[in-house]
Curated annotation (Swiss-Prot):
NCBIfam families: TIGR00703 family protein (TIGR00703). It comes from the Bacteria. InterPro entries: UPF0128. Belongs to the UPF0128 family. This is UPF0128 protein aq_756. It comes from Aquifex aeolicus (strain VF5). HAMAP family: UPF0128 (MF_00264).
Length: 229
């Protein structure tokens, strides 16, 4: 079988498992989640106006700085969300770049407190919490994030009934993660084992980006990829 024919055979025999649904437009988070991302919720002044905003952790009360053409001053570092306010975040894209946008909400009023590139923050989040499988296998980040993992030489993929337990376990774990996230897609080509009994495979896994900023979901996704080896 030549290379072109093999590529075609792999495409035709890759197994696809989908948790169908519309990726959520936004997700509610806690102030603890914000800290896990590396930010504090601040009550202070932005361009001289008293308001709430997010600042990278490590700054102190009284600190003043300029960033992105705006001036900031910290009056208080909050330990809880302000009364009657909730924290929501969603993903926006501009010129091919995904941004995470966090807002404080009270009724119909939204106050944007954070807007930063999602790929950079997501990678920092994975590394900070030692989610090495997610960090090492991150492929691309938009509204949907792709992870891609490959082991060994490619050959004709095996059918589902011939998958070993380790591959089936991964699919089961992935399904549970996708139900938590509300959407997901796994494309798996399992090629068999090497002479040393190592698994040969390639897998692409799609998950909603905003859901990956939930530590519980990311930890379970990391475990799923980690155990598939």
């Amino acid at each position: 079988m030549d290379k072109k024919e093999l590529v075609e055979k792999i495409a035709l025999n890759t197994l696809v498992f989908e948790t169908l649904g519309q990726p959520e437009k936004e997700r509610e988070f806690t102030i603890q989640d914000l800290r896990r991302w590396g930010f504090d919720l601040i009550l202070g002044k932005k361009n001289g106006v008293r308001t709430f905003f997010a600042s990278q952790a490590g700054r102190e009360v009284g600190d003043k700085w300029e960033e992105g053409g705006a001036t900031y001053e910290i009056e208080e570092i909050l330990l809880e969300l302000p009364e009657n306010k909730k924290l929501f975040a969603h993903i926006e894209t501009s010129e091919g770049v995904a941004y995470i946008v966090a807002e404080l909400r009270e009724g119909k009023e939204n106050l944007e407190i954070l807007r930063t590139p999602a790929p950079t923050l997501l990678m920092a989040f994975f590394k900070k919490h030692r989610l090495h499988e997610l960090a090492n296998n991150l492929k691309s980040v938009g509204v949907i994030t792709e992870f891609y993992k490959q082991r060994g030489r490619e050959s004709l993929p095996l059918p589902y009934k011939k998958l070993p337990l380790v591959a089936r376990d991964f699919l089961e774990r992935a399904k549970k993660v996708e139900k938590m996230a509300g959407f997901g897609r796994v494309a798996l080509a399992y090629f068999g084992k090497t002479r040393e009994k190592d698994n040969r495979f390639r897998v692409s896994w799609l998950l909603p980006t905003i859901a990956l900023f939930d530590i519980d979901i990311s930890e379970k996704a990391n475990t799923a990829l980690e155990e598939f080896k």
